[in-house]
């Protein structure tokens, strides 16, 4: 039995997410998804400082004050059902309604650098599309991942939704990742991490959405306000001690 999405094995976590996804698409509509997301934001916003302190305590990375800002963005600004478009095509033959269907169960890998923000943001976006997700968290952030998964699931249940919209094995390893990647129920893989992680996910032969190495350049040319550019680069590159892969790493 799971404990708000936490299971002893990856196979149990996958099975629970698969069962939840079937119930999700059968019994709940777009308005329900909006309600679940609103409840996640409502219940987790007051816990942002708690989450930030937990991340720093467990991983030893970054700065608490910056994690507060990062987790706030993940909880309050991650896109929901408004990002799921629908359309109607009219012709002499009638009307055709176009809408996006869910993948089903998604397998996701999360990093030690952004353990709580990644899980919450991923789950909001994925459930907006009618999916459920099985996370394989970084082993150095198990407490963070557990808090995020349980917090999200509790909010959804409190809003009248199904259990196990997001799940994870209690003790994630490379072996549990294999169990998730190659599970027939898992139709899409999502990864946040480095090039090795991307290569591993690609080996499953499934659709993959993954972020590889982050080395973004900044171009500062003759039209730039140098003082403003320097201040912006400094603020970005020092945010959370430069943990974010999107922060400036080199300059042209």
Task: State what each model feature region is.
Residues 1-97:
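N-terminal Rossmann-like NAD(P)+-binding subdomain of aldehyde/semialdehyde dehydrogenases
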Residues 84-155, 159, 204-208, 215-216, ...:
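Conserved small-residue-rich beta-alpha loop and adjacent elements
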Residues 4-5, 198-252:
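ALDH superfamily catalytic-core signature
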Residues 85-98, 166-187:
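A structured beta-alpha segment of the ubiquitous adenosine-cofactor-binding alpha/beta core
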Residues 27-41, 173-189, 196, 200, ...:
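Aldehyde/semialdehyde dehydrogenase
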Residues 135, 168-170, 190-193, 208-212:
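General beta-strand structural signal in soluble alpha/beta enzymes
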């Amino acid at each position: 039995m799971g404990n708000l999405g936490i299971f002893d094995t990856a196979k149990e976590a996958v099975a629970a997410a698969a069962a939840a996804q079937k119930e999700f698409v059968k019994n709940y509509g777009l308005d329900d998804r909006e309600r679940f997301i609103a409840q996640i934001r409502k219940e987790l916003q007051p816990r942002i400082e708690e989450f930030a302190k937990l991340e720093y305590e467990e991983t030893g990375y970054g700065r608490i004050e910056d994690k507060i800002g990062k987790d706030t963005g993940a909880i309050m600004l991650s896109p929901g059902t408004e990002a799921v478009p629908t359309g109607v095509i009219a012709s002499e033959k009638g009307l055709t309604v176009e809408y996006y269907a869910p993948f089903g169960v998604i397998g996701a890998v999360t990093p030690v650098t952004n353990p709580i923000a990644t899980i919450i943001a991923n789950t909001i976006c994925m459930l907006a599309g009618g999916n459920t997700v099985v996370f394989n968290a970084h082993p150095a952030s198990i407490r963070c991942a557990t808090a995020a998964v349980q917090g999200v699931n509790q909010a959804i249940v409190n809003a009248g939704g199904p259990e196990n919209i997001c799940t994870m094995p209690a003790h994630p390893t490379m072996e549990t990742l294999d169990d998730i990647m190659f599970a027939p129920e898992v139709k899409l893989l999502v990864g946040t991490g480095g090039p090795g992680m991307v290569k591993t996910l690609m080996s499953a032969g499934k659709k993959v959405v993954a972020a590889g190495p982050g080395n973004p350049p900044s171009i500062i040319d003759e039209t730039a306000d140098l003082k403003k550019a320097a201040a912006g680069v400094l603020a970005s590159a020092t945010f959370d001690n430069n943990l974010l892969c999107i922060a400036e790493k080199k300059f042209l």
